[in-house]
């Protein structure tokens, strides 16, 4: 194989090797330096939802259509591009987090961080606190939540709606200014387009 081909295919091969090894840390370090150990699917609510997910960082923005399901055995997330291509598939069974995507295309955000964000937004507050180190503080109200460490805000969230998976969930992770906005689609909406009469 010549050097040019190796240069072109090396990133894709590295990404596939990482996926094949299932070497995703179940205790990811969030922007700001605090680690969070993912909690079991059984400690969260059972639900399924179709959501429009917008991920923004550093002026760049990715939009996905996500199918998310949680039950006592596993959390599963499938992310589709606006054109319908599967760009991310993540499963978490309480022991191992596995992610896959098309060759040569990395996920828009660390899959373990994405699962952590879902847990901060949707899991009971006590379950979230169980995954945090002692110096981190998680405050969770009906519509707002905040993670802080040593007086610094690291994650803020706002949700609307009465029950999981909520109508909207907006999360900001500092200091990276990583924004994740999730909007639950209903039978009246499809792909962000209102189809109600």
Name the predicted role of every residue range.
Residues 73, 93-95, 143:
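Envelope-exposed proteins and targeting segments
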Residues 2-12:
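Bacterial N-terminal signal peptides that target proteins for export
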